[in-house]
Amino acid sequence: AELNAVDERNELTATGRELAKLPLDPRIGRMLLAARDQQCLAEMLVIASALSVQDPRERPLEAQEAADQAHRRLADDKSDFQSLLKLWNFVQEKIEHKKSNRRLTDDLKSHFLSPRRVREWIDVHGQLATIAREQGWRVDTSPASFEQVHLALLAGLLGNVGTRILDADRGEPPYAGARGIKFHVWPGSPLLKKAGRWVMAAELVETSRLFARTIANIEPGWLERVGAHLLKKSHTDPHWEKKAGQVMAFERATLYGLVVYAQRRVPYGLLNPEHAREIFLREALVEGELETRAPFFAHNQRLVREIRELEHKTRRLDVLVDDELIF
């Protein structure tokens, strides 16, 4: 259900049927399908292949500071996925201008990159590109936006999102995740001190604590666009709104227990037509809150005014029946 591959009857959706044809991990496959639709397949082939192999960046114990400094040059402060794209471009440039394989190997090592893992990354990228070609997918040549790439990633990572806990105690996990979990940002991430209110992670790793690795800042609105099939919605305080001219309610949506939005005004008529009609009759018609030039409404309002004037003149308060009887 998370990948929108099956419906509420547990039958394959159109997305599920496409995923079933791909010889890939379902999450990776879902990202690629979304990337095809978002027109960012070139970027996703790079990221998906990177997520399928061991991280090529090395951090030897005897040179941790130097390695961190080298890796920071290719880091992005909003997304670890963007850092992978920068790293790929760096590697491709080195390959393009290599003088020999030996020189290339030495060059990669000097930047604390594992030549063997880089080769694995390139090989897997080639395999994914072949699959995309066999499916007849078009790889766009123009660069995709941050939003396009991360919407596609989110399609495969909806279960790995988190929102910042604003009142978290020092040392406590700063993020609340899906289904009640809490997690920290991986210490090696450039986003450690720059992570936003909402993040998504490629993976959650349990060591001494639960950590989110390879993360990116995301917008809560993206969760609606990509995860609409998973949102649980509830509605409160249905009421007549004179300005809107209809019965409205407040909507709250959650994704795996995380509040995506709350107190959103939505039309109530489509949600509960019978109750909305009752509120309309009581608050709009009986209480005279409806703004209309309809003859029947003007007639009723005139009768109410005349009866109230009669009550005032006769000093009786029981001529006009109460709202319940009018309703």
What does each of the following model-derived ranges do?
Residues E2-N10, T15-F327:
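Extended, charged helical/alpha-beta scaffold domains that provide interaction surfaces
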